[in-house]
């Protein structure tokens, strides 16, 4: 089943990287496709609230500052289709969440798709 037209939304990601490292590349941690500004904003807020108890005091303060003050800026920016970034540093690691406005293109529905009949001809090989 195909959707009939492109849909506006937000692509959300979470990355981590060592602070000050010139050799290590950022590590991708998670992504989320949000179909509203509120949904995108909520994804970051839930992640921050979830990890806040495990953060050091400076990182926890930064997280709560965004949740109380910075989140309002994010809520105003997203409907204007402006990208937003939230970053905190904890124990030598920078954790960054990004929210970018995107246009989701129509694709085949992810559920209910059947594999071609020939897919049953291939057997899993045990390497043990």
Identify the meaning behind each predicted range.
Residues 49-128:
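Short, mixed-charge low-complexity intrinsically disordered segments
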Residues 4, 8, 35-36, 57-59, ...:
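Intrinsically disordered, low-complexity regions enriched in Ser/Pro/Gly/Gln/His and often acidic
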Residues 25-42:
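A short, exposed loop/beta-hairpin motif centered on an aromatic-Gly-Thr core
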Residues 22, 42, 107-109:
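Short acidic, gly/pro-rich beta-turn/loop elements at beta-sheet edges
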Residues 19-21, 39, 104:
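Generic "edge-of-domain/loop-turn" microfeature
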Residues 1-28:
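Short aromatic-glycine-(Arg/Gly/Cys) micro-motifs in beta-strand/loop hairpins
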Residues 9-15, 30-33, 85-87, 96-98:
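Ordered hydrophobic segments in well-structured contexts
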């Amino acid at each position: 089943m195909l959707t009939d037209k492109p849909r506006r939304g937000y692509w959300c990601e979470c990355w981590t990287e060592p602070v000050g490292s010139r050799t290590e590349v950022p590590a991708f941690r998670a992504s989320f496709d949000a179909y509203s500004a509120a949904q995108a904003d909520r994804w970051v807020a839930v992640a921050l609230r979830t990890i806040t108890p495990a953060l050091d005091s400076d990182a926890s303060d930064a997280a709560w500052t965004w949740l109380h003050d910075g989140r309002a800026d994010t809520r105003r920016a997203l409907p204007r289709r402006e990208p937003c970034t939230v970053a905190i540093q904890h124990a030598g690691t920078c954790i960054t969440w990004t929210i970018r406005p995107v246009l989701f293109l129509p694709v085949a529905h992810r559920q209910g798709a059947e594999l071609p009949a020939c897919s049953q001809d291939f057997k899993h090989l045990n390497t043990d």
